[in-house]
UniProtKB/Swiss-Prot annotation:
Sequence similarity: Belongs to the universal ribosomal protein uL16 family.
Subunit relationships: Part of the 50S ribosomal subunit.
Any one of the GO CC terms: cytosolic large ribosomal subunit
Protein name per the record: Large ribosomal subunit protein uL16
SUPFAM superfamilies listed in its UniProt record: Ribosomal protein L16p/L10e
Gene3D superfamilies on file: Ribosomal protein L10e/L16
Taxonomic classification: Bacteria, Bacillati, Bacillota, Clostridia, Eubacteriales
């Protein structure tokens, strides 16, 4: 499970998700990618489920890169607790994903296998996604600065 080893502050504000992703919106490592089409919080369990689905399908070949990390703590109060008495304790971690963010990358497998593996991962995530090739994303060359 992906969780930060140390954090400066245990609790965070929820924040807002405005606009499109300005970073992490190009394929840098792999040949195929899974791009988010809408904003969402993606939990560490969802990321892990998508990773397992992809790696099981591609079996031994290929390499998978996870481009998002759950670094935002989400707090929750116990059920049937009265209002007040402070903020709840951290329950799980999420990655904040904006539209256009490349979440997973895949390389070293044929196109049909890559697309099917990413499609399986798509079903594990709470966002609409699209599968893209490196050439389809503008500025998709890893050597561009």
């Amino acid at each position: 499970m992906l969780v930060p080893t140390r954090v400066k502050h245990r609790k965070q504000h929820r924040g807002r998700m405005h606009g499109k992703a300005t970073r992490g919106n190009v394929i840098t490592f792999g040949e195929y990618g899974l791009v988010a089409m809408e904003p969402a919080w993606i939990t560490n369990r969802q990321i892990e489920a998508a990773r397992i689905a992809m790696t099981r399908y591609i079996k031994r070949g290929g390499k998978v890169w996870i481009k998002i990390f759950p670094d935002k703590p989400i707090t929750a109060k116990p059920a049937e607790t009265r209002m007040g008495s402070g903020k709840g304790s951290p329950e799980y971690w999420v990655a904040v994903v904006k539209p256009g963010r490349v979440m997973f990358e895949l390389a070293g497998v044929p196109e049909e296998i890559a697309k099917e593996a990413l499609r399986l991962a798509m079903h594990k995530l709470p966002v609409k996604c699209k599968i893209v090739r490196r050439e389809e994303l503008e500025g998709g060359d890893a050597n561009e600065n």
